[in-house]
Regions:
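P-loop NTPase switch/coupling surface
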Residues: 1-202, 219-224, 231, 237, ...
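Loop/turn-to-beta-strand initiation segments
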Residues: 289-291, 322-326
Length: 354
């Protein structure tokens, strides 16, 4: 699953129209995309918009009705006039362009008429009276959504291996490391809703903490646990995460190389090291085959010497799962990287009337 185009109207400062993710040379959907532009141009807004629309799609698949007022995606999406995301397919269910859409009725109808090549799966439109209507494109083909909907349920309700893509959204402002204060070291399960839409959520509770999830991974998938630890350790200088956990302690320790019996907790790592842990772990742990990874400023807090190797590791993780990576950055070195091996998109903003 890869995004091939995004359509916006009145979404933050973004200009109205199409944002194409098709490579200009190969005419294929690009698997690595960089969004650039000055502060306030809408880079972060666009990533959040995609994540919110995917979150809404989960509700539409489950309930087959409009989002309730209490749903966080509704509160955010209803601020804009229109948003549509077109994928090259959602394998193994749809092997042709499919789309999700939400917006004002007139804009939605115009977009549908202009893009008959897209199979629109579901969405919502809002009339002039502010009445919201579920766009049920399933009427002429009963059961068209059901296989995808059933796989989503298996994703969020079971630990089964499921052949269905997901979306990972890692917001820059949310990626703050907070030491746990409640229920520390308790054996608590991961929230399976992360298998549909993965986000990093700041919490002082042990449940949901990266460290707690990493320890759970050792119990459930030992081979992947050691693989993740190896990936993380390559970015730590003069130290390494000890994969062995002392019985009764249920905490991970970071050993200092060359110093016997000297260690500290994950909480004591630097801000840049925490960023590396968050990015690599969440992608390694939760990305489904064919998934999409959205990262707002992956170079945040990082020393310039680490940025290239971190991006290479993330790109490899996404490539191994046949997915798509979309990031934002202000770093010129990152711009050059994606101009040479990917697609860099300079976002356009609306021109306000004088």
């Amino acid at each position: 699953m890869k995004i091939l185009a995004i359509y916006t109207k009145g979404v933050g400062p973004l200009a109205e129209g199409e944002i194409s993710l098709i490579n200009d040379w190969t005419e294929e959907v690009e698997s690595t995309v960089l969004l650039t532009g000055p502060n306030g141009c809408g880079k972060s807004t666009l990533l959040r918009a995609i994540a919110m629309l995917w979150d809404a799609a989960g509700y539409w698949l489950d309930q087959r009705k409009v989002l309730p007022p209490s749903h966080k995606a509704r509160a955010w999406l209803q601020r804009w006039d229109g948003l549509a995301v077109v994928f090259d397919g959602i394998q193994p269910f749809y092997n042709h362009p499919v789309g999700l859409i939400v917006g004002k009725c007139d804009w939605v109808n115009e977009l549908l008429q202009n893009h008959h090549e897209v199979t629109w799966l579901t969405g919502e439109s809002t009339g002039n009276d502010n009445k919201r209507t579920l766009l049920n494109f399933d009427l002429d083909n009963e059961g068209f959504l059901n296989p995808w909907a059933e796989s989503r349920k298996r994703l969020i309700l079971t630990h089964d291996k499921v052949d269905a893509p997901n979306l990972i959204y890692l917001d820059a402002e949310e990626r703050r490391w907070v030491a746990p204060k409640r229920n520390v070291s308790e054996s608590l399960p991961d929230a399976l809703a992360q298998r549909w839409l993965t986000k990093y959520q700041v919490s002082e509770d042990w449940q949901g903490q990266l460290e707690a999830s990493l320890i759970n991974l050792k119990t459930s998938q030992l081979h992947k646990y050691h693989e993740v630890i190896r990936n993380l350790n390559q970015f730590l200088s003069g130290k390494e995460i000890d994969p062995d956990i002392k019985p009764g302690e249920s905490r991970l320790r970071v050993k200092l190389k060359g110093q016997r019996c000297v260690s500290h907790s994950l909480d004591e790592l630097s801000a840049g090291e925490h960023q590396v842990l968050i990015l690599i772990y969440l992608i390694s742990r939760w990305m489904q085959n064919g998934g999409i990874v959205l990262i707002d400023e992956p170079d945040l807090y990082l020393h310039p010497s680490l940025i290239g190797s971190l991006l290479a590791t993330i790109e490899q993780l996404v490539k191994e799962r046949d997915g798509q990576l979309i990031i934002t950055s202000h770093a010129v070195d990152v711009w050059h990287r994606y101009e040479n091996q990917g697609k860099r998109i300079e976002l356009k903003t609306r021109v306000e009337p004088q």
